[in-house]
Amino acid sequence: MQIISNDEHELLTTSQIELVESILQHAAQLEGVEEPSELSVTYLTNAEIHEVNREWRGKDAPTDVISFAFDEMGDEEMDFMLDEDEPHLLGDLVISVERCREQAADYGHSFERELGFLAIHGFLHLLGYDHMTPEEEAEMTARQEEVLTHFELKRGNV
């Protein structure tokens, strides 16, 4: 899977971006994501994600992660975008690095654990997972923890 990482403000280290990419690659393998496929991950400030949240979701507040799934587009929108030899476009993840740092401190675990959590959480949304019912939440939580545990990113390991 091709991952396009955008960190124009240099909010993360190279190793942190590589960790996110490794987490997403591992999750894609576990989920059987078709190849070739592509997604982008953009790292923003709280002010920037606040603007994205207001413009695209109608919510006037910053948030931690937003997923924009290409598969949620209508058939007409998809027809002109996809050729057979083009990668399957999964979508875009937008992560607030500031909110990530705040939440890591609030939850008492490492920044890397929270960053990994936000990445896998958003990625699973791109694949159609949700947490609207207790059953959906349990399934999504189990998948998230499976991936994070693989990378030894457990709760409380500051």
From Swiss-Prot:
Any GO MF annotation of the entry: zinc ion binding
Keywords: Cytoplasm, Endonuclease, Hydrolase, Metal-binding, Nuclease, Ribosome biogenesis, rRNA processing, Zinc
Cofactor: Zn(2+)
Note accompanying the cofactor annotation: Binds 1 zinc ion.
Location relative to the cell: Cytoplasm
One cellular component term from this protein's GO annotations in UniProt: cytoplasm
Pfam family name, one: YbeY
PROSITE patterns for the chain: UPF0054
Entry EC no(s): 3.1.-.-
InterPro entries: MetalPrtase_cat_dom_sf_prd, YbeY, YbeY_CS
GO biological process: rRNA processing
Residues binding Zn(2+), per UniProt: H121, H125, H131
Stated role: Single strand-specific metallo-endoribonuclease involved in late-stage 70S ribosome quality control and in maturation of the 3' terminus of the 16S rRNA.
Family to which the UniProt record says this protein belongs: Belongs to the endoribonuclease YbeY family.
Protein name: Endoribonuclease YbeY
Underlying gene: ybeY
